[in-house]
A protein has these predicted regions:
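Acidic/histidine-rich alpha-helical segments that form the ligand environment
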Residues: 80-120, 131-149, 153, 188-195
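Short, contiguous pre-domain boundary segments
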Residues: 1-6
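Intrinsically disordered, low-complexity segments enriched in small/polar residues
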Residues: 62, 118, 198-200
Length: 206
């Protein structure tokens, strides 16, 4: 009974964070969903591509249930892995998000069909023999981590935060409130830095 509860709980969280991840692209231009927003090139549509490959492998191939569409291999092909993190001009947003949703359906079928202790094999892990529980936790963690990245990227673009439409202004706080909050945090950070510098300068050297 507890095993079934654990599987349903983890699966429910995965479904929720997937939708939040896709929502991060809503309302943005083609340029904004694709453009690099960090020095290493992190971008919103690339995160979707990466998570598609993650689920296709971990909740498909690992349990002998391969996703029927081509996905990049994780066998040391750096070029393929790099291409998995961004979208070319020939790849449409609808195509990439559509494939992600199809992977969801494939993953959901795997989760529904297998017991939480069903065995799998992840050859690139130090302990390659795993259970569905290990892999489900890993995929949930990976998706949540990248949803956090997406949250920051989206806020940088247009100030939108949260996990669904309306979250950004649900507390009734406007831009002036957040600018005041940011200024207060900046003031505190500078004050702490100044105090630390002064303390260091006044320290007696041995």
């Amino acid at each position: 009974m507890i095993d079934e509860f654990a599987k349903e709980y983890l699966h429910g969280d995965l479904r929720w964070i997937r939708e939040a991840m896709v929502w991060k692209l809503d309302g943005l231009s083609e340029y904004d969903v694709r453009r690099p927003l960090t020095p290493t090139g992190t971008n919103l549509l690339g995160l979707i591509k990466h998570l598609t490959t993650t689920e296709a492998w971990y909740l498909g191939e690992i349990f002998g249930r391969p996703f029927p569409e081509p996905v990049p291999r994780w066998d040391g092909d750096e070029a393929a892995l790099s291409a998995n993190m961004w979208a070319t001009e020939d790849e449409s947003r609808a195509e990439i998000i559509g494939r992600y949703r199809r992977v969801w359906a494939h993953s959901d079928a795997t989760i529904d069909a297998l017991a939480i202790d069903a065995p799998g094999h992840v050859p690139w892990w130090p302990r390659p023999d795993v259970k569905l529980f290990n892999v489900l936790v890993h995929v949930l963690t990976e998706t949540t981590r990248h949803a956090g990245h997406a949250d920051i990227l989206r806020e940088q673009l247009d100030g939108a935060t949260g996990v669904s439409a309306g979250d950004s202004d649900e507390l009734g706080r406007d831009a002036a409130f957040w600018e005041s909050r940011r200024a207060e945090i900046e003031r505190a950070a500078r004050a702490a830095d100044t105090a630390n510098t002064a303390e260091g300068a006044g320290a007696v050297k041995p």
